[in-house]
C-alpha cells in the first residue's frame, strides 16, 4: 500500500465517522487530530529521554491518544478508567517528591523539558477539542482525558528533575 494517494493535494482529506466523509484540511476535526498527533509524537520523543521503567507508561498514553482520536471520529475504547489511571500515576509520583510550592520554569533535565513541551502541546490539543465540541459531538471522556494528561505531564516533568537530581527553578 502506498503512503500517498494524491486525493488530498487540493486541501481536503477523508475522515471516518459513521461513514467516510471528505473535509477541508483546516476543519476543526482535522485540527484536533493534528494537535493530538503532534502531542503523541512529542511523547514519543519524551520516551527517548526517560529510563526504561517509565516507557510503558508513556506508551500507554500514546495508545490512549489514538483512542481519543478514534472517539472523535467513530469509536474508541477510551474510558473513565484511563482517566483514573492517570490520577493514580499523578498521586503515586507526587508522593515521591517535595510539595510544589510555586510556579516553576519549564526545563531542567532533557526529559523534564520535553515533558513540559508535551504539557503545552496537550493544552493546545485540549483547546482544539473544546472548539471542536462546539460543532461536533465529542465524548466527554476525551476532554477529561486531555485535561488530566496535562496534569500528569506537569507532575512527570517535576519528577524527571527529581530523578535527575536537578533543582526546579521557581518563577
Task: Describe every region a protein language model picked out.
Residues 1-171:
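Phosphate/pyrophosphate-binding loop motifs in nucleotide- or prenyl diphosphate-using proteins
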Amino acid at each position: 500500500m502506498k503512503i500517498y494517494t494524491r486525493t488530498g493535494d487540493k486541501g481536503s482529506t477523508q475522515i471516518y465517522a459513521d461513514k467516510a466523509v471528505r473535509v477541508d484540511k483546516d476543519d476543526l476535526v482535522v485540527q484536533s487530530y493534528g494537535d493530538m498527533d503532534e502531542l503523541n509524537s512529542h511523547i514519543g520523543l519524551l520516551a527517548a529521554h526517560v529510563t526504561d521503567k517509565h516507557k510503558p507508561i508513556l506508551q500507554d498514553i500514546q495508545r490512549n491518544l489514538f483512542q481519543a482520536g478514534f472517539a472523535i471520529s467513530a469509536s474508541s475504547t477510551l474510558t473513565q478508567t484511563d482517566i483514573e489511571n492517570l490520577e493514580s500515576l499523578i498521586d503515586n509520583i507526587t508522593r515521591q517528591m517535595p510539595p510544589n510550592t510555586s510556579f516553576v520554569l519549564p526545563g531542567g533535565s532533557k526529559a523534564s523539558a520535553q515533558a513540559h513541551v508535551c504539557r503545552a502541546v496537550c493544552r493546545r490539543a485540549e483547546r482544539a477539542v473544546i472548539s471542536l465540541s462546539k460543532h461536533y459531538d465529542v465524548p466527554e471522556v476525551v476532554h477529561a482525558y486531555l485535561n488530566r494528561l496535562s496534569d500528569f505531564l506537569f507532575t512527570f516533568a517535576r519528577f524527571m528533575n527529581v530523578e535527575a537530581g536537578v533543582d526546579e527553578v521557581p518563577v
